[in-house]
């Protein structure tokens, strides 16, 4: 029974991390983050 709880917690952690990462990537591509030299290097330069 304890193993199932651990698996569920692990899945929740992965889902939360993935959601945060998706939000961060969307923010960067949306241009809400101020454009910097790193944005140009990675190819996400704003038009």
Swiss-Prot record:
Signal peptide: 1-19
Residues with a covalently attached lipid (S-diacylglycerol cysteine): 20
Residue positions of covalent lipid attachment, annotated as N-palmitoyl cysteine: 20
Major site of localization recorded for this protein: membrane
PROSITE patterns in the record: PROKAR_LIPOPROTEIN
Topology with respect to the bilayer: Lipid-anchor
InterPro entries tied to this protein: Lysis_col
GO biological process, one term: cytolysis
One GO cellular component term noted in the UniProt record for this chain: cell outer membrane
Keywords per UniProt: Cell outer membrane, Lipoprotein, Membrane, Palmitate, Plasmid, Signal
Superkingdom: Bacteria
Function: Lysis proteins are required for both colicin release and partial cell lysis.
Protein name: Lysis protein for colicin E8
Organism from which the protein derives: Escherichia coli
Upper lineage: Bacteria, Pseudomonadati, Pseudomonadota, Gammaproteobacteria, Enterobacterales
Name of the coding gene: lys
């Amino acid at each position: 029974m304890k193993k199932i709880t651990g698996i569920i917690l692990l899945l929740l952690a992965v889902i939360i991390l993935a959601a945060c990462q998706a939000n961060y990537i969307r923010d960067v591509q949306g241009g809400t983050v101020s454009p910097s030299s790193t944005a140009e290097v990675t190819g996400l330069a704003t038009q």
